[in-house]
Amino acid sequence: MKESIRSKLENLVERLDEVNHLISDPEIINNQNKFRNLTKEHSQLTPVVETFNQFIQNQGDLQEAKDMIKSGDPDLKEMGQEELPELEKQQATLEAELQKMLLPKDPNDDANIFLEIRAGTGGDEAAIFAGDLFRMYSRYAETMRWQVEVINSQEGEHGGYKEIIARIIGDGAYSRLKFESGAHRVQRVPATETQGRVHTSAATVVIMPEAQDVEQIDLNPADLKVDTFRASGAGGQHVNKTDSAIRITHIPTGTVVECQDERSQHKNRARAMSLLASRIMDERQRIHDQEIAQERKSLVGSGDRSERIRTYNYPQGRVTDHRINLTLYKLDEIMQGGLQQVVDPLINEYQAEQLAALSEDSA
């Protein structure tokens, strides 16, 4: 293990000791914010320190096995030779685990998200595909026990959506889906195609972390144009009787958001403000990510929304993620919500990039 990494881990051991003392201090206990922040830090530090302690213990056992091999006693030498391979394997595993634990954590990883899907080239078929993608993400959310709330949608003429915006609420939603942003392409024979020809259509996906605190995003009320209008679509007797739908325009950036899913204008306004704040925060973060990606030549977290990231080929039953050259012949399974088969390799690739960067910084 590199000295710089070991030093970081030793500092974390000291910090955990300090946090242990602080959370038993009556003054801290009476301060809810401080106590909550410290208990959160305690829960983050504990697994790292426990793994580091295992690493140190294993290192001692490893040295002991080497000393046994060097000793003149044949029995001890044999015992040491038997133990050494397993101890070396454990040491390598623990070191790799510790390096992953030291990777910088994205502060938005635990956030809820806004999912935006827009039909691209391909007309009606693109809208149908946008609907298929929304169903895929909704089913994946179900498997993760997340909640999905539709904020706004514009249905396609022959099914699917020209645009749909949803909020996904659940632990780790952003950490799991943040690499889904980009252009998704589908190759298949549309239901309306009489000649059996394969058509190519596309939809764009945007994943944004929900702003934790709308007030933290500097939104000057003078920069906002708020319009109310009557909600359209299903809703029975309540439709078109009140101006409950909300449209907010952020004048400096030209960003426009709408929310008409709730019957209450107050609720629609709150949701629209949350979406607007998240979009503005996301745009700032995207520019930042692009700058870092250019420096690091990152494949996964590039922040480029126009990049074609994935192809869904129905005749071949194939899904290909172009960023990491991943091809899976499990299209039906993935479209039914088995998205972890794509998500996990993307996260692993991103962590590998981060580890490479950590090694460079520690060199």
Curated annotation (Swiss-Prot):
GO terms for cellular component: cytoplasm. The modification N5-methylglutamine is found at Q237. The keyword Protein biosynthesis applies. Methylated by PrmC. Methylation increases the termination efficiency of RF1. InterPro entries: PCRF, Pep_chain_release_fac_I, Pep_chain_release_fac_I_sf, Prokaryotic/Mito_RF, RF-1. Keywords: Cytoplasm, Methylation, Protein biosynthesis. GO terms for molecular function: translation release factor activity, codon specific. Pfam families: PCRF, RF-1. It is found in: Cytoplasm. Belongs to the prokaryotic/mitochondrial release factor family. Peptide chain release factor 1 directs the termination of translation in response to the peptide chain termination codons UAG and UAA. This is Peptide chain release factor 1. It comes from Hydrogenovibrio crunogenus (strain DSM 25203 / XCL-2) (Thiomicrospira crunogena). The lineage of its organism: Bacteria, Pseudomonadati, Pseudomonadota, Gammaproteobacteria, Thiotrichales.
